[in-house]
From Swiss-Prot:
Residues 204-220, 274-286, 537-550 have a biased composition (Polar residues). It comes from the Bacteria. This is Protein VirD3. Keywords: Crown gall tumor, Plasmid. Residues 230-242, 378-388, 649-661, 668-678 have a biased composition (Basic and acidic residues). It comes from Rhizobium rhizogenes (Agrobacterium rhizogenes). Residues 306-315 have a biased composition (Gly residues). Residues 1-43, 178-254, 274-338, 366-405, 438-457, 469-501, 530-558, 587-611, 631-678 are annotated as: Disordered. The keyword Hydrolase does not apply.
Length: 678
């Protein structure tokens, strides 16, 4: 042991532990070390076995696929030998013929020895060229320096597999750990191998280089949350499972273009600017990767083709801060319509200008009617004051002389030049028609009694529309008071005269006056017999309800100057019948029928029906007004009424039993009635 030398195959005592106890086992392991850092610490240790590389697969490296590639730890106890290699080998070293725990312990002890003796790495590295002299095939190794804290060596071993070894003593970059954690893989650990079939990596190996470009800002199209992109390791690894990592040094140009297309045109496409920073040596800091430039060109070209309108102007663009620029609509130019002549274009422009002016004129001339005016809620004059000269009755503004008003021209947007094809005679005829139509509509509207205005005037008072009919005279079609004096409002709102209706004859005027007189008389009679004021009275659980009563008053005497036709008396009789039909007159019935009705109402919980006489002599049953109660008060009233009726019936029964009166004989037959009271 003391005379051992560092050769291509050297033996190092390694204390191992097994079931039999502690002992020392010699293992033959070829090794080499990478260049040391400036502070003297080693950055990586590449490990291979002493057996030929094509003879088998080391322990702890399971089979993986291209789609489900993952990082696995090189623990021999968790792996099984591939098919065809499970038979017993006699040429294996002694450490490989032992159990898996001995091999793991020996490897750990060997790494500790290398860490304690950094001065021997040069001697170990110098022994590497002797491998070719001894006839041993050296594994194909490609160094991929990562950041300042780690270095990765890719080695090709037997059966078409590659091993990416991370140094045991190297510090893992925090960004790389975050990126692996976001993918659910966990951070890279010491002694962890990334194994994938070399056939799947053949295309990527031809594209990759031994170094990465200088730290630069790469504009990459990426679909997904930004947290999955920031801190992702883009040095040499590509996660094919998720498809989210875009590594420019490894992926081909065709794959980059396809990725840019699929990610830009998707619904989740986002244009992000990710700063992909990689650490390289000072000698390679000045070099710039052409893949980065091509990636930027492809991204900008794809986004530019889809973000342009018909005229070549950009429609939508995204900056690196994810804030969209304002959208600019395309503008039409004369070049877009080569079939149109200059005259046609000028005509189109003139039409567009006229339409624009008309729309602006309508907006400026429209009256503001939606503004709330608290003081004019019941005033009809307030609307005309706010309508900019527009009359309150909605008449079109027409000049007295028959000409057009300037305000009407402004409100409609029409001018005389717009109707150059109309002659003076046609314009005069139009003015005459407008004037006659306005006069006719105003005459008909003013001739009718303004009952709607009466309702507005008395909206907050006690008088009703019926009482307002006092202002309408009998012998005049215009509203007036009973004494013949016209009210100011009636004079203002009604200005009809015989001259307004030249087509009506005297007979038609007389018929209209008689009809109006009949209507007013019926209204007055109904007002005398029907009171609008509510009277209250108490009953069995009944609340205050309006009662119907007669109000004394002298009937209105018709005008004696006008003859009263015979059909007027018929109409008066019909009106009196309708008014009298509203009064309920209880009928006089026997005590037996009244008791039966009360008992039925008590039994079924319904109000007791009352009897009344119709004006034609028929006796009908009707429900009194006092018993029509709604809601909870009705139920309480019925309950109280039933309790009172039960108490009254019990009192009557006791009185009849004591006095032995006649009502008890009703339920007895003739035989029992003979001996009753003896």
């Amino acid at each position: 042991m003391a005379n051992e030398e560092f050769t291509g195959h050297f033996a190092r005592p390694a204390p191992v532990a097994n079931d039999e106890g502690r002992r020392t086992t010699s293992t033959s392991i070829p090794a080499h070390a990478m260049a040391a850092r400036e502070d003297g610490r080693d950055t990586s240790v590449a490990v291979t076995l002493s057996r030929p590389p094509n003879s088998g697969i080391p322990h702890g490296i399971p089979e993986t696929s291209a789609s489900g590639r993952r990082l696995v730890a090189a623990h021999p106890q968790d792996a099984a030998m591939p098919l065809g290699l499970s038979e017993t080998r006699t040429d294996l070293p002694a450490i490989l013929r032992k159990n898996n725990g001995d091999f793991r312990t020996a490897m750990q002890h060997w790494r500790e020895l290398l860490h304690e003796n950094p001065d021997k790495r040069d001697r170990e590295a110098s022994a590497l060229p002797d491998l070719g002299a001894r006839g041993i095939k050296r594994p194909r190794e490609i160094e991929h320096p990562g950041d300042a804290n780690r270095s990765v060596t890719r080695r090709e071993i037997g059966l078409g597999r590659e091993i990416d070894t991370v140094a045991a003593s190297s510090l893992v970059n925090r960004d790389t750990w975050v990126a692996h954690s976001s993918n659910g893989q966990g951070g890279p650990q010491a002694g962890v191998y990334n194994v994938q079939p070399s056939a799947d990596r053949a295309q990527e190996t031809s594209q990759e280089s031994s170094t990465l470009p200088d730290p630069t800002s790469v504009s990459a199209l990426y679909s997904g949350p930004p947290s999955e992109w920031v801190g992702r390791d883009t040095g040499y690894e590509t996660d094919r499972n998720s498809g989210d990592t875009i590594s420019a040094p490894i992926r081909g140009l065709e794959e980059l273009e396809d990725s840019a297309d699929s990610r830009y045109f998707g619904h989740e496409a986002q244009s992000l600017s990710a700063n992909v920073t990689t650490s390289i040596s000072n000698a390679e800091a000045s070099s710039h990767s052409e893949h980065t430039e091509i990636l930027d060109d492809v991204s900008s070209a794809r986004s530019g083709e889809q973000g342009r309108g018909g005229d070549g102007g950009a429609i939508l663009g995204f900056s690196h801060d994810l804030s969209p620029h304002p959208q600019r609509l395309p503008q039409t130019t004369p070049d877009d319509f080569p079939e149109l002549t200059n005259a046609a274009m000028a005509e189109i422009d003139a039409i567009f200008e006229s339409l624009s002016q008309k729309s602006l004129a309508r907006e400026s001339a429209a009256p503001v009617l939606h503004e709330p005016v608290s003081g004019d809620a019941f005033q009809k004059e307030g609307t005309s004051d706010r309508a900019d000269g527009m009359p309150s009755n909605g008449e079109p503004p027409v000049e007295q002389a028959g000409g057009h008003l300037p305000q009407a021209l402004r409100s409609s947007g029409a001018e005389l030049d717009d109707f150059s094809w109309l002659t003076d005679a046609a314009l005069a005829e139009i003015d005459a028609l407008i004037k006659s139509h306005s006069n006719r509509s105003s005459s008909v509207r003013n001739a009718a009694p303004d009952l709607r205005g009466a309702g507005l005037d008395n909206a907050v008072g006690k008088d009703s529309v019926i009482e307002h009919a006092e202002k309408i005279s009998i012998d005049s079609p215009r509203p007036a008071r009973l004494n013949g004096e016209r009210s100011p409002k009636a004079q203002k709102s009604s200005q009809a005269s015989l001259a307004d209706f030249p087509d009506l004859t005297d007979a038609e005027w007389a018929h209209i006056e008689e009809t109006e007189r009949i209507a007013i008389t019926a209204i007055e009679k109904g007002k005398q017999k029907i009171s609008t004021k509510a009277d209250t009275r108490s009953g069995f659980g009944n609340s205050s309800v309006p009662q119907v009563g007669n109000r004394s008053g002298a009937p209105m005497v018709p005008n004696t100057n006008q003859p009263i036709p015979s059909w007027y008396h018929k109409a008066e009789n019909i009106s009196n019948g309708l008014v009298e039909d509203t009064h309920i007159t209880p009928a006089v019935v026997s005590s037996r029928r009244r008791n039966d009705a009360e008992n039925a109402s008590t039994r079924f919980g319904d109000p007791a029906p009352a009897l009344r006489h119709y004006n034609l002599g028929r006796t009908l049953e009707a429900t009194p007004v006092r018993d029509v109660i709604s809601g909870t008060s009705r139920d309480r009233g019925l309950t109280a009424h039933a309790a009172d009726q039960l108490a009254i019936d019990d009192s009557r029964k006791r009185t009849d039993r004591d006095r032995k009166t006649q009502p008890y004989i009703r339920g007895l037959d003739s035989r029992s009635r003979e001996g009753y009271g003896r």
